[in-house]
Amino acid sequence: MPDLIQTKSVVLGYGVKMVLAPAKAARSLLIREEAVWRFSLPRVLSTPTTMLETTEPIAHASELDKPSIVVTNTEVDSEDNTSSVLGRYIPQKCLQNARLAAVNSCVNEIFEARFRERPDAPAVCAWDGSYTYRELNDRSSALAHKLRRRGVQAEVLVALLFEKSKFSVVAMHAVIKAGGAFQLWDPSLPVARLGGMFAESKAHLVLASAANARLAAEISENVMVVDESLVPPWESAPLNPGTQPENALYCVFTSGSTGKPKGFLMDHRAFCTCALGVGELLGLNGASRLIQFSANSFDLATFDHILPFLCGACLCIPSEEERKGDLTRAFNRYRATHAVLTPTVSRLLEPEKLTTLQVLLLAGEAPSREDIRRWASTVGLLNGYSPAEAGCITIVNPSLQESHPSKIGFPVSVVPWVVDPDDCNRLVPAGEVGELVLQGHTLARGYFGRPDQSKAAFIPTPAWVRQFGYETYGRLYRTGDLVRFDAEDESLVYIGRKDSQVKIRGQRLELGEVEHALQQFFPRPQIVVVELLTAEDREPALVGFVYQPGSSQHMPAPPQHQDNSLFLVADDQFCADAQKALASLRDILPPYMIPSDLLRISHLPMVPSGKTDRRLIRMRAVDLAPEERRKYSSVLGQSRDQPVTQLEESLLGLWATCLKLPPSQIGVLDNFFHLGGGSLEAIHLAAEARNMGFAELSSAAVFQCPTIREMAGMLDGVTASVQEQDPRGCTSFQLESSLVAELLRKSQCTLEDLQEGFLPLTPFQEKTAKMKPMHLLLDIPGIDHSRLEAAWALVLEKHISFRSIYVEHQGRVYQAFLRQPDTVSIPIRWCDEPVHECAARFCEQDVDLILDGRPWWSMTRINNKIDSVLVLRLTHAQWDALTLDVLFKDFMAAYESRELSRRDLEFPAYMRFRLRHNASPATVRFWSTFLHGSRLTQPLLLDGAAEVDPGNEAMVFVSQQIPMLTPPHGITLGSVFRAAWAFVLARYTGQEDVVFGEFVEGRSLLVKSVEKVTGCAAAETPMRIVVSPTASVRDLLKHSQEQYVARIPYETCELEDIVPSSTSWPTDTTFNHILVIQHEPVLPPVALDGRPCPHRWAFHGRLEDVYVQMVFGPDTLHVGMSGPEIRLSRTIATQLVEKLASTITQFNDRPEALLSEITV
């Protein structure tokens, strides 16, 4: 065909210029054979569909009957034509509200502006405290100065390792103010993963909370712990970090296909450009309260932590317990107006019960129709989309109520190009499916140390960007997501992924990373494939498929494959291997990346190109009937144990609802997490359980008792995993033989004299053994003396603790237990004066400390002609309240020749078990966790100007009586007392996280008959309560009770043992004061032969400690303080007791009030 000569140029529309041009220069599309029309149009239009649509009218309008048309590239002639052509690829409506210009500002500059506008406005409202903008500014500035001295400046990266806390906000802003960049870490991630991210990002420093200090130390030697002492509340000197918009702001890691997470940096310009547009869409302003829920490993957590401060709003941070508990209640408690949640998390909320929520942005995964239905009439509902590399939220559907779930909406701050999935240099017309490429100033820089992956994802500018004049709108990122523009509203519609990236529970992951990790446990030639299975009737599940060539012939799947021959029955060996692999993955991958099941496949299906046919594997697995799935599963393959109680039946129904599984697929011994459950499902299960009256089943309990049988046991009060133990055979605790020999020498005893050998005293016993003895005086006029001696002989034979002796050696006191003598002799002293005066004088003289092996317990009868008093000398190291009750009931029974109570467990056996329990790793771990990051609260109890006389033995006693109270439902009066004292302490000291001592009975060990042991089981142990100023009274009461319950199994461990093993406190730390809850009376009414025998106590010397007491009377409560005058001012005690009594009453009467409304 001859070349043609250009004769004229005609603009035909859409930027098309019809020309005559050499045939070899044109891209030809044959329309007619006989003649050729040549015309040019931009390369962006050069797709077959576009050419057909554009050339068809030209061919019909031609004077030639049989033209042939050739398309070539050309430049767009005019701005109008450019817009017209662009509209063929990006609908005009799609871009009309996008903010494409860069915001050339830094986060610290915008925060400073908001602070100057409203310095006293609330900035942070967290479970552990609140800050105004001024307070946040001052504290973060103070920390920023310290960071600058530690080398933090522009482009220096700092890792943040915090639980949900106000301190994470301070740390984040401090890094930004110092000029550095941060990466927010989730402490629940495996330490190996955290260490890998630290190394790959070349982070300089780890800022950690006190609770995570030890974990941080495993990752880096350069650790700074952030707590109240490091962020003083006073204003710091201004700091000019010199940050530029192009400097790094934060680092994020996402899942990587090579087996390691991919990290990248986001700069200030990118974040500000993205965030300000989203903030405007959400309507965030000074009255807004955004609640922070996302896990720290999720990029949305970074978005949550910064966005409110750019808009003058308040960030609300619930605790981990609140996040995993009643989420609806937490939203209401913090008065949240805005939230950014995954649809999965939003399903845990009850929309009709939310009182303040106004705007909900769903992000991280696709919502369902049911999600839209639940929320559409309740709040302003939006959907957000964006890969982390392109900005936190770059595309938003602002009217999700009226949309299909797949519509992701319109761009906020990017240009959404849709390209040929196989060639990103070619655009596809609006309405056709293609890969989404995002262009804008919101993009990350690229991946750490991965130039090839960076080049593949952050692509060079294609020619069509320049042709449309869009080269000034930033760089481009290939999302890997397939989308199209909707024909009706011109919004973007999400179709699916083009690669191996998937999302589960809002987290994006590379299937290749999971496969890489799993392959280590099934070495080649075995082949591992991991896929995300989705079905309408259940939550998405990550499932692994293992092909073992030795088990079957390797063959591609035939097209007509319609049965289940793809799968092999899971034998015992495969099940064992699979369970071992899944358990090992928990050490190297986050929970959301661990497959819920492994299936064994008979062959590896392939497509004609030789690649694995993943689609076929997914289809076959999803189509498996439940009974078929059970045969092939490595975790579901065991036989199902059926419920045997009504409680187990009820729990099975709850599981089926939460896991979206038929009840027939669940057995009472199945593991909740092996059936596809995760932390969110655990929260859902706990919430559903509360609705059915199982308030004790928390999400934490789901992790502790992951089977139905264990849960039922826990709810019944007896777990399958923890049974009461019999300590009588516990002989593992022994002293060194040389020490025993020395104690025998000092006590002048032989082993034959002892029924039980030497044991150390508990700290409380030792403290009381070093005090002067106390005396109990019992009126016994007319009581037969021989019967009296015989009765006490029986009582002392049974109760070995009153045959104890004490020996001091090198500052420690040890106890041993004498054999019972054949007879008991009670001496009688006669006097002429009133018997009580004589008894009092006798007690005053009988005050020697006995730490040389002589018995403490002694009895003397003092008579005159009319009256008689039995004086019993004893030490609190021998008894507690329960002991005296049992002791005197046995005494009355013995005197009247009745049968004594059953002897179940003797005190020495109990003590050996207790000593072993207190030193156990579980006890050490509990106290390390319970007290981590805390400090003992030491309120000022003396007047500053008061002079202290060490010789002053005077005591202070202050008490106030209040009517007996009925506490709120589900709360004990003890919990009210603890919470009220914590509140008074917090107000008095300014320390919201308070720790004080508490006297406990010490009978919480899982030991048979522990309640019948006679001896001193009492202990003085720490109690920690956090008084959040934003909490309600009920929140604090519940927290107080939860702390008490959590401590119960470990309350026998006392401060002297806890400090060196579980804290970083000074080893000489002692309690400033001790809480005591006492139920009067300590002794039962004593009567012998029907004759009442009144009793009274005689105390000597001075108590060394300050006690805060609540004593239960018949119809009243007595609240008071007591202590030595050299340690407790009467004035201060009076003030504190008044505040305490008032607080107890207000807490009891106004449980729904906010703590800020309580006046003291």
From Swiss-Prot:
The keyword Repeat applies. The modification O-(pantetheine 4'-phosphoryl)serine is found at residue 679. One of its GO terms (biological process) is bioluminescence. Residues 749-1025 are annotated as: Condensation. Signal peptide: none annotated. Disulfide bonds: none annotated. Interacts with the mitogen-activated protein kinase mpkA. Belongs to the NRP synthetase family. This is Nonribosomal peptide synthetase fmqC. The lineage of its organism: Eukaryota, Fungi, Dikarya, Ascomycota, Pezizomycotina.
